[in-house]
Amino acid sequence: MQQEATGGQKIRPIPIIASFLMAGFIGLFSETALNMALSDLIQVFDISSATVQWLTTGYLLTLGILVPISGLLLQWFTTRGLFFTAVSFSIAGTLIAALSPTFAMLMIGRVVQAVGTALLLPLMFNTILLIFPEHKRGSAMGMIGLVIMFAPAVGPTISGLILENLTWNWIFWISLPFLIIALLFGMKFMQNVSVVTKPKIDILSIILSTLGFGGVVFAFSSAGESGWGSATVLVSIIVGGIALGLFVWRQLTMEKPLMDLKVFKYPMFTLGLILVFISFMMILSTMILLPLYLQNSLALAAFSAGLVLLPGGVLNGLMSPFTGRLFDAYGPRALVIPGFIVAVVALFFLTRIEVGTSALTIIVLHSVLMIGISMVMMPAQTNGLNQLPPKLYPDGTAIMNTLQQVSGAIGTAVAITIMSAGQKAYMETAQGVGPEQMVASLTAGIQNAFVFGLIMACIGLLCSLFIRKAK
């Protein structure tokens, strides 16, 4: 841990983390809040459902391209400079989106927003590692977890309330003043805590990273809509896979790589990465499946569906600071292993939901699942990063955040694919094709998709048995 900022003044960790919490909360709120407005946007701009999905795909694609090179940016620019740049991009993107008269301009606004998020998240994790000692990082990461989990949880509910009373533009207008406050707060309290080394920039590595991670994220993000047999998806996977292979080979053979893969020599980092990867797949697939189930099988309105999922999301966020303190006191094993056990139990019962399952049952099962995931996510991530030497913090945070985006895209695509296959199989044996059969087929498909989540949770539980407190 550093005691002084690069200018010589004493580091004040609390105001620094508060700056990140404000900016991060609004950034991540905006990321998910727009999901509730997609059906409205189809009518407003007279576009197809495939086109409107680009608001999500484009956002994920921008993250997938920029987050991998964030390790380089962290070594080239100061903490204050990157923070102001990130929040400025978020403000500009939000303003463009709020004023958008066309879908194309809204799309540009979303991409600009994503640039801000892609810069902010790795910077936030890297700064926490630098300003907090190891025995306090769990609590600090828990506060970050509160934002990362809580903002996406309340986003759909708040946006649903906005959409019932105002137009979709107000999702962005309401976010704008809070981002400006975060920028002003950061101008006063943000300090330079990182060391600017300005390593050599390898253009070929950046190109390979962009093609590799961008291609993979795009392929999986598009697969749910276009299908795995789509030429676009197949070409993206092939190009992305080849580029990733060449990227890894180049990083291993370079003296000063863009992304230092030596982080994988540290076993707790690698294990933590696997556990976070699995957890994110479970979260993102659940965020896709349960709204579909609630709105179709239980015939709830979008706002009501958001309310059903709100308790679990809020619990997940509120648990993060608590699990962070427990991590500091007892280490990762006391949290991660029980967390996966809780997740396995919740997912087992989610595989058995039916058309007549009550909303209360879904609230309970979703809340239990979110509690389990909160016991896994931040402890596994913090423990993994703790094992790295400070010089590898930028690379470790970049890799951790990159694979979260990749895992989210994969989890969503696989869940939708399994659900669609389950629907099709059910309809082939169903008597008739009326509304009741359609609802029953969707429910059967969602059951199958939750089996995938259950299998991932079981794999996570087995892997968690090997976790040890990093030294």
UniProtKB/Swiss-Prot annotation:
GO terms for biological process: response to antibiotic. It comes from the Bacteria. Gene3D superfamilies: MFS general substrate transporter like domains, Multidrug resistance protein D. One of its GO terms (molecular function) is transmembrane transporter activity. It is a multi-pass membrane protein. The chain crosses the membrane at residues 13-35, 55-77, 84-106, 111-133, 140-162, 167-189, 201-223, 227-249, 269-291, 329-351, 358-380, 445-467. Keywords: Antibiotic resistance, Cell membrane, Membrane, Transmembrane, Transmembrane helix, Transport. GO terms for cellular component: membrane; plasma membrane. InterPro entries: EmrB-like, MFS, MFS_dom, MFS_trans_sf. Proton-dependent transporter. May mediate the efflux of lincomycin. PANTHER family: LINCOMYCIN RESISTANCE PROTEIN LMRB (PTHR42718:SF43), MAJOR FACILITATOR SUPERFAMILY MULTIDRUG TRANSPORTER MFSC (PTHR42718). This is Lincomycin resistance protein LmrB.
